[in-house]
């Protein structure tokens, strides 16, 4: 196993930082300039807007003013402490919180009433006639598109390179089940490290830099292989997602996590205990694949 040198690692990071900064600036400008940015029904639009927070927002982990809640209320991230609405053009400036955050180590130390007021401001700081004030994204917009992900698993697998780091998969992903999935989605089971690469694809990870950098297109989490190598850690395909990522939280109409739902559908068997009534798995997958295979 070859480890990247410090120079190679720094070069990759510098390039990615420049690309991210440029791409997020372009995305922000594009969203602000668009004539039709109000699409509270669109999951694709929500994920695109969420991307503006990836390397900027200072309060990612706070449930009340974190990136998910801000994005649900129609705000784009302009900088570490500033939100902007692309419809009414109003802004929310939280620069004053930086000092409070520094003194308390965490926003969790803020008085609950203060946090509640901040959360309310996500709605009230829009202008009175702003569409985002009248109707925000529905809370369940941030979940997996099941039909799309059933197809994307195979595409992610085909694009993955040979792994360069030890990988930890869920224990339910046995070789027998993974081979079953490989046959179902018609990918090369003889490919080197096929079982592990399929497990990576089944949990939502794609490659941004071949063999070096993985990315999730839902929570926009990026993981550098060199970080794991230098610390002697495994790539835990579930733990590395953000805690709010649809791949690792219960999905609508079921208490199964995102990856569990996709895995069960592809295996065509009941693997995980579910307390809610779910659809007929075999009927759903047969119909979905007969429809989607024709689009390949």
From Swiss-Prot:
InterPro entries: NuBaID_C, NuBaID_N
Zn-finger (C3HC-type) residues: 40-174
Domain of life per record: Eukaryota
GO molecular function term, any single one: structural constituent of nuclear pore
One CC-aspect GO term: nuclear pore nuclear basket
One annotated GO biological process: nuclear mRNA surveillance of spliceosomal pre-mRNA splicing
Entry keyword set: Cytoplasm, Metal-binding, mRNA transport, Nucleus, RNA-binding, Transport, Zinc, Zinc-finger
Subcellular location: Cytoplasm; Nucleus
Pfam families: NuBaID_C (PF08600), zf-C3HC (PF07967)
UniProt cross-references to PANTHER family, sorted A to Z: NUCLEAR-INTERACTING PARTNER OF ALK, ZINC FINGER C3HC-TYPE PROTEIN 1
Biological role: Involved in the export of mRNA from the nucleus to the cytoplasm.
Protein name stated in the entry: mRNA export factor rsm1
Gene source species: Schizosaccharomyces pombe (strain 972 / ATCC 24843) (Fission yeast)
Annotated gene: rsm1
């Amino acid at each position: 196993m070859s480890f990247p040198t410090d120079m190679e690692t720094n070069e990759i990071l510098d390039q990615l930082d420049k690309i991210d900064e440029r791409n997020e600036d372009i995305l922000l400008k594009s969203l602000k300039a668009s004539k039709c940015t109000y699409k509270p029904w669109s999951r694709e639009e929500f994920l695109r807007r969420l991307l503006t927070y990836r390397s900027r927002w200072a309060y990612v982990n706070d449930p009340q003013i974190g990136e998910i809640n801000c994005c649900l209320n129609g705000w784009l991230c302009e900088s570490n402490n500033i939100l902007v609405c692309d419809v009414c053009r109003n802004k929310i400036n939280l620069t004053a919180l930086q000092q409070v955050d520094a003194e308390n180590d965490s926003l969790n130390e803020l008085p609950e009433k203060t946090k509640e007021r901040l959360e309310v401001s996500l709605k009230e700081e829009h202008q009175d006639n702003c569409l985002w004030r009248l109707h925000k994204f529905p809370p369940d917009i941030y979940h997996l598109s099941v039909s799309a992900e059933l197809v994307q698993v195979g595409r992610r697998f085909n694009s993955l390179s040979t792994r360069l780091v030890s990988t930890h998969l869920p224990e339910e992903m046995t070789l027998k089940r993974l081979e079953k999935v490989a046959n179902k989605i018609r990918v090369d089971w003889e490919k080197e490290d096929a079982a592990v690469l399929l497990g990576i694809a089944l949990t939502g990870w794609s490659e941004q830099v071949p063999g070096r950098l993985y990315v999730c297109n839902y929570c926009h989490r990026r993981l550098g292989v060199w970080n794991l190598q230098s610390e002697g850690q495994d790539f835990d395909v579930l733990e590395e997602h953000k805690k709010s990522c649809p791949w690792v939280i219960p999905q609508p109409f079921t208490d199964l996590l995102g990856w569990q739902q996709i895995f069960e559908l592809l295996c065509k068997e009941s693997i995980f205990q579910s307390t809610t009534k779910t659809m007929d798995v075999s009927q759903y997958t047969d119909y979905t694949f007969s429809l989607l295979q024709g689009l390949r």
